[in-house]
Amino acid sequence: MLFFGTYDHNLDDKQRLTIPSKMRNKILNSTVYVSKGFEGSLEMRTEEEFEKWSSQILNLSSFNKETRMITREIIANTHEVEIDKIGRIKIPNNLLKLANIEKSVYILGMGDRVEIWDQKSYDNYQNDNSDRMEEIAETIYQGLNK
């Protein structure tokens, strides 16, 4: 199951987020997991993807300080959320605060997961990094062809 596209949405007054219909149709009647992401985002995964992803983290050595830190930051900031009958999820307050989300969000399909960004934060991220995209793409592409 692949998620793709960028969608502009708003939280309602009860801090619920409507999942875009193209994404929602892929995850109806299932549980999803919302976690602290990277660069100020949140990440949403299906149960199957969350189990794969979290097992990779949890299989790292707990004797390593960085492993403990990333486990604390991500796994401890993950919540199992239900999708209601009309395709909304309630994002817990602590995650909204971590991502500086108040109302307006972008929902980004990222293949195996969905990123949820505060719109201003994502716009700033894009502006700060747009000049580097070609350079990064070249570096990654060269690494794939070795």
UniProtKB/Swiss-Prot annotation:
Keywords for this protein: Cytoplasm, DNA-binding, Repeat, Transcription, Transcription regulation
Subunit-level organization: Forms oligomers.
GO molecular function, one term: transcription cis-regulatory region binding
A cellular component annotation (GO) from this entry: cytoplasm
Highest rank taxon of the organism: Bacteria
Protein family: Belongs to the MraZ family.
UniProt xrefs under Gene3D superfamilies: Transcriptional regulator MraZ domain (3.40.1550.20)
One of the GO biological process terms: negative regulation of DNA-templated transcription initiation
Database matches in InterPro entries: MraZ, MraZ_C, MraZ_dom, MraZ_N, MraZ_sf, SpoVT-AbrB_dom, SpoVT-AbrB_sf
Protein name: Transcriptional regulator MraZ
Subcellular location field: Cytoplasm, Nucleoid
Domain SpoVT-AbrB: 6-49, 78-121
